[in-house]
Amino acid sequence: MGVGGWRQADHLDLDALLRDAGERDRLLGELREHSIELVCVNAAGNPLHPDPAVGDPHAALLRGAVELAALIGCDRVVTMSGCPGGRDGGSTPVFASWPVVPDDESLWQWQYEHRLAPYCRELAAWTAQAAPGVMICLELHAGASAYNPASFARIRAASGPNVGVNLDPSHFWWQGMDPVAVIEEVGPAIGFAHGKDTLVHADRVRRNGLLDLGFPVDPETASWHFSAVGTGHDDDAWAALVEALRGAGYDGVISIEHEDPRVTPEESIETSLRTLRRACERVEAAA
């Protein structure tokens, strides 16, 4: 359930829940009444945004999410690493993705040394004191400084075991990564998982590549877009992913995300649920 940040749907009133034990009891009671288990608090945003009007509220939101998770007995908070600005200041994040010239090559390292590592180190230390049972799970996402196993490993080295991975395979497929190989790489650092697919249109990729500035995406023209589980990759791919998660020691939920621009949320969730159930049944039958 989300508390704000980039998410338009704020499922939880963070301030009220932090302030009032009665509000927390009411929330937990309503969840029990509807047989709903709250397994994660989501605070996706950019706490490293160079504009304080954006970065400071997102950083405060993340800490509030960690505090709330501890108060309501939830041990996972999902967010992203964030992305800082460049060396020369400015109010816009700079995503260092491809070292075309020497300046680009050194940018990520500068961001890591001066922004990412200090922030993650301090956040991990604070979390260990304020909410020792909570893991902050970074969704590896292009546009954030932690977007693949190598960049996450650097952040993990600066923080520690209470900063892990939210494994969302949809962000790997369009970048050319194999989610199973990613799972093998990050292994026990996986603290949460999302169920979301990616539909890559090969004919459009041949003409226009994978990088696209259009948002929200137009599924009629985009080279790729997020899709319901099973509509971008088949049952074999999803069964292999579930098996890899279990092999890595992850036995938590796979939280379905709806971001398929072609269908309603209800259709997306129903399709995703059917695919994931088949994948889990195959893995269980083969065990």
How would you name each of these model-derived features?
Residues E30-E33, P47-G164, A286:
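Active-site acidic/histidine proton-transfer and metal-coordination neighborhood
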Residues L12-L17, P50-D56, M177-P179, P265-S268:
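Short, solvent-exposed loop/turn segments at secondary-structure boundaries
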